[in-house]
Amino acid sequence: AYSAGRRADTAAEAAQMTRLYVVESTFTITGAAADHRLRAASSHISALAARFAAEVLAKLGKPAAFKVSGLKVSDEWVKECVADLVQAKGQALIVAGDHLSADAHRVVALANAALGAAVRYAAVPAVRAGTIADLAAKPAKTLVILGGNPAYDAPADVKFAAVAKAATKVVRLGFHGPAFDETSALAQSAGGTFIAASHYLESWSDGRTVDGTYVPVQPMIEPLFPSFTDLDVLAAFAGSTQEPYALVRETFATLAKTKSDDAFAAWLAEGVLAGSAYPTVVDLTLAVPSAAFAAPELSLEKLEVRLLPSAHAGDGLYANNGWLAEAPDPLSKTVWENVILVSPKLAAKLAIEPEAMVINKIGALNRNINQLVDGRLIAKIARLTVDGVSVTGPVFIMPGLADHTVGLQLGFGRKLGGRVATRVDERLAGRVTGNGFDVYPFLTTAHPAFRTGVTIELTGGTTPVCNMQDHWSMEGRDVVREGSVGDLEKNADFAKLGIDGHAPAVYGKDGAMSPALKATTTPRGNSAYEHPDHAVAPNLVAWKGHESELKIQQWGMSIDLNTCTGCNACVTACQSENNIPVVGRDQVLKGRNMHWIRLDRYFFDGREQAGNAIPEDPQVTFMGVACQHCETAPCETVCPANATVHDDQGLNTMAYNRCIGTRYCANNCPYKVRRFNFLDFNKRVDGHYYEGPLGPEKAVKDPADLPQLQRNPDVSVRMRGVMEKCTYCVQRIQEAKIQAKAAARDSGRTQVADGAIQVACQQACPAGAIEFGDITDPNSRVSKAKASTRSYGALTYLNTRPRTTYQAKLRNLNDKMPGALRLPLSRREMAGRESHAPAHGSGHAAPAAHGESAHK
């Protein structure tokens, strides 16, 4: 829904674009996408919600005086935001986070009702269930644990080990046995029974959505191992011998009031049972909360800790997933571990020097070079303490945090959990080297999301932090291009910066070509030379009469920065599709990660910074960068073995068996998107990379052959000494071409239809930010995206002529907001870049866009 409201190529479409305000304590991808963002401690947001609701109700003539105390926030920010909400009455909505208090949700519901927001509340049936606290008070004779891992992630005040040991019999259904799971190990120590659980993709089951709609769960594959589902176990306890499939059919027949095979098949195909949702609350009478909304005082001595699920491990469930462990956190870009996130102001109070990031944008660039050792980020270690409980971890300075809020990620510090979760290094006599630190000691039943009254102290130690992006700023370059809705209204070509804005007209007869066709046949810069036309097939005689249908299709991609949220789905989808290995923490610290897509994150401040100060309240933009499949690719000209060449479809291809590993191509690639297999990452596991070809058998082969089962048989598995990169999923292109030829039969119409090919990153993108297809077809979706006024190429002044282009980001700014700037902060940086260009070299300076002064 968010992405659908952010698509705009014309002034008329931009006028209908949604505007997003976000109030949060730590930086999230939602906050990064915001047009206006306010930093506030989590413990203050309930009071701030009451303040917002009171302002909304007062403006709409329904005053409600809520008791708010201790809240320090910009009155102007709140009033202008509320004025915008009221002006958009009927099309405005306030969403409260699930970690806020019940009273906060109540006042937000009141405000939404006054705004005319179409919010439906479902009447969820009451469930007869007790709590773990009830179990502690009255131990169960038989304790059945279905899934989860309460021995690891139960609230700290719940002594789950005591609960389990007090039971006469413990039955544990879980994915991992006692050697790899804390709860399974606890059940074993209590003399219990372990039952291997089936994955949901191997199971028949059913469930309810948030609004109560009845949905099926159906298996996609046969179970890999002998295992059982929740339904198997519950049915056995109930004395039933029915299979899960029969139980699901029985439940469906009860709810759908039919035993028809056709009705059941339709339910499986559609995925929902119409009319099965819980009834909505029609008369939503919400009493004005009588409770006072108090914002506690925060300081260096009384900090707030925000507890968040990890982008890598969730709450710990995915801690043993190597793809997620090595997928960078969207904002901090850390991998394989969690860190203590602190604000720049808090870091200054703790006398922690900023890392060696390029962070000063306007004025002279300053670096602090004392924090990097051999290219590694060295972080100071700190201890956090609350109510006598302490956790220790590395400190990471993060822009955009509330001043006295510390961010902690859950899901790390597992004592058991498998090769990835615990990183057992067999080279060190089986010693567990650690994978982050456990912060669950801070989580209690009364405080599931944040704690206040926390103290912090430096221990004096340091440790390397595994971080995939040390560079924070574009230094005023025009790699990522942004504009406001006002920019688009005044100048549709606002994204044409630098050489794009000053290149001469396309030569002669080619002036009427579509932008996509110009990109394939005409060099930039008014040259009279044209590349050879690859559109004529060599076997026209065999296809006489169908010459127009025999053009060799030219593939290209467009990425819309305005809808990209930086979620990392494309990174992991590419890794899954193309057999990209997980290399491990030690190799990432050496800069040897293998991802074909790099999701760059840039902070923009646009204000003069003193010394090496990190900006406290920046804007953020994400940019997905993979091989650009350049028309004039710099990598091709330097390869001595012709291992990377251009094919007639416009793809920059790799011949792996020709590659001799000189890495000249990686050196000459201006986008830095090529990856080199320094070791046999696909053949061996972490901890055995250096053992050589005669190493022990266990280093070569997984006992269950699971890695082999995971790999895509249509993609080559690369070995040591070979360079690799994005291929535009050439295996999917070939499959689509084969299917098109089979469907054509004698007609000769072998062109692949638009949309028939979805590359892995495009298919996984939840925002629909990626378009891929034939750029010589002016009616294809990718051609229309490239014809957008927001379309541009990265580093085009190098005459690489990339096949992948981008659509500039738009921010729908409210000019009345305090501190609002006419241009997005990245544009201010570009405009102010000349003040430090001489010190950094003028070879990559970007001229200002048409009609825009470089001095503001």
Residue ranges and their predicted role:
Residues 569-588, 598, 632-658, 664-682, ...:
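Iron-sulfur cluster-binding cysteine motifs and their immediate structural context
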Residues 699-707, 711, 721-856:
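Long, compositionally biased charged/polar accessory segments in the mid-to-C-terminal portions
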Residues 216-217, 536, 598-623, 690-732:
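Surface-exposed acidic, glycine/proline-enriched linker/cap segments
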Residues 85-137, 305:
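A glycine-rich, hydrophobic/aromatic-adjacent loop/helix-cap motif
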Residues 2-99, 113, 240:
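Long, well-ordered, tryptophan-enriched scaffold segments
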Residues 1-33, 118, 124-129, 133-224, ...:
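A cross-kingdom feature strongest in bacterial/archaeal respiratory oxidoreductases
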Residues 228-254:
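Non-catalytic, well-ordered alpha-helical segments in soluble enzyme domains
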Residues 356-373, 686-707, 739:
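Surface-exposed intrinsically disordered loops and tails
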